[in-house]
Curated annotation (Swiss-Prot):
The gene is ghrA. Pfam families: 2-Hacid_dh_C. Its EC number is 1.1.1.79, 1.1.1.81. InterPro entries: D-isomer_DH_CS, D-isomer_DH_NAD-bd, GhrA_Enterobacterales, NAD(P)-bd_dom_sf. This is Glyoxylate/hydroxypyruvate reductase A. Catalyzes the NADPH-dependent reduction of glyoxylate and hydroxypyruvate into glycolate and glycerate, respectively. Inactive towards 2-oxo-D-gluconate, 2-oxoglutarate, oxaloacetate and pyruvate. Only D- and L-glycerate are involved in the oxidative activity with NADP. Activity with NAD is very low. It catalyses: glycolate + NADP(+) = glyoxylate + NADPH + H(+); (R)-glycerate + NAD(+) = 3-hydroxypyruvate + NADH + H(+); (R)-glycerate + NADP(+) = 3-hydroxypyruvate + NADPH + H(+). Keywords: Cytoplasm, NAD, NADP, Oxidoreductase. The active site is at residues 227, 275. It comes from Escherichia coli (strain K12). Optimum pH is 7.0. GO terms for biological process: cellular response to stress. GO terms for molecular function: glyoxylate reductase (NADPH) activity; hydroxypyruvate reductase (NADH) activity; hydroxypyruvate reductase (NADPH) activity; hydroxypyruvate reductase [NAD(P)H] activity; NAD binding.
Length: 312
């Protein structure tokens, strides 16, 4: 069994050694331009077209929760990957726990009005503020996949009203489910906090725009943990300036790194983190990949395969 590995920023040597230890029967090598030798599996992140084109692979693993970097290249270069080759993403591998920590900490930050107190502190102003009430602090989750379900579970501990929206209806205990474009407005109407965990597909690009933001209650909050392309940044800035949106926590952006000239940096109601809400944990990723390869070799059914038509 031959495995090729490519990631532009990961510690390649660590990964190769860890994979060799986890899959002793495999010959694992770092892929470099010009390497056309045979391979059974490819582990990749933002792979060059030549790495995958023409290969008779058993499967490709994207080294992250999203596969948009691969699917976007496939649109321009359909020869890059045979349609019959299964494409897998890292469904969790520790990302769910990280998303839970990130989402809960920020929701509580807003719920306890720490954002308002920070603004007061900046002007040396001492003034206790009325508290928010849980029953009026409904949290809506856009995108009801693996990570969305994890975030919902963690927020249930804090007894917030919860709702989710996705392409198809979900049956999550204690979570009101909305499905399809026809139910999006009803979903948004009660969301004091909107958490975006949608996949990146042609249908979701630019979905968080002026029309969507106007359907939120006045003074709502936005937490974007998915992809920057989901948000029309000018529309969000306008909503923040008008007070329609009271605050935004943004981990992802249309351009990354976020350019220094972006007005988001200096906006008093925006908090920025550099795409760190959930990073790939190497040890857990290696365990998932080795387990999945073992299942594939045995002909067993496995989880995490991407539907290329849907984009997730």
């Amino acid at each position: 069994m031959d495995i090729i590995f490519y990631h532009p920023t990961f510690d390649t040597q660590w990964w190769i050694e860890a994979l060799r230890k986890a899959i002793p029967q495999a010959r694992v090598r770092a892929w470099k331009s010009g390497d056309n030798d045979s391979a059974d599996y490819a582990l990749v992140w933002h792979p060059p077209v030549e790495m995958l084109a023409g290969r008779d692979l058993k499967a490709v693993f994207a080294l992250g929760a999203g596969v948009d970097s691969i699917l976007s290249k496939l649109q321009a270069h359909p020869e890059m990957l045979n349609p019959s080759v299964p494409l897998f993403r890292l469904e969790d591998t520790g990302m769910g726990e990280q998303m839970q920590e990130y989402a809960v900490s920020q929701v509580l930050h807003w719920f306890r009005r720490f954002d308002d107190y920070r603004i007061q502190q900046n002007s040396s102003h001492w003034q206790p503020l009325p508290e928010y009430h849980r029953e009026d602090f409904t949290i809506g989750i856009l995108g009801a996949g693996v990570l969305g379900s994890k975030v919902a579970q963690s927020l249930q501990t804090w007894r917030f009203p919860l709702r989710c929206w996705s392409r198809t209806r979900k049956s999550w205990p204690g979570v009101q489910s909305f499905a399809g474009r026809e139910e999006l407005s009803a979903f948004l109407s009660q969301c004091r906090v909107l958490i975006n965990l949608l996949p990146n597909t042609p249908e979701t690009v630019g979905i968080i725009n002026q029309q969507l933001l106007e359907k939120l209650p006045d003074g709502a909050y936005l937490l974007n943990l998915a992809r920057g392309v989901h948000v029309v940044e000018d529309d969000l800035l306008a909503a923040l300036d008008s007070g329609k949106v009271k605050g935004a926590m943004l981990d992802v952006f249309n351009r990354e790194p976020l350019p220094p000239e972006s007005p988001l940096w200096q906006h008093p109601r925006v908090t920025i983190t550099p795409h760190v809400a959930a990073i790939t944990r190497p040890a857990e990723a290696v365990e998932y990949i080795s387990r999945t390869i073992a299942q594939l070799e045995k002909g067993e059914r496995v989880c995490g395969q991407v539907d290329r038509a849907r984009g997730y």
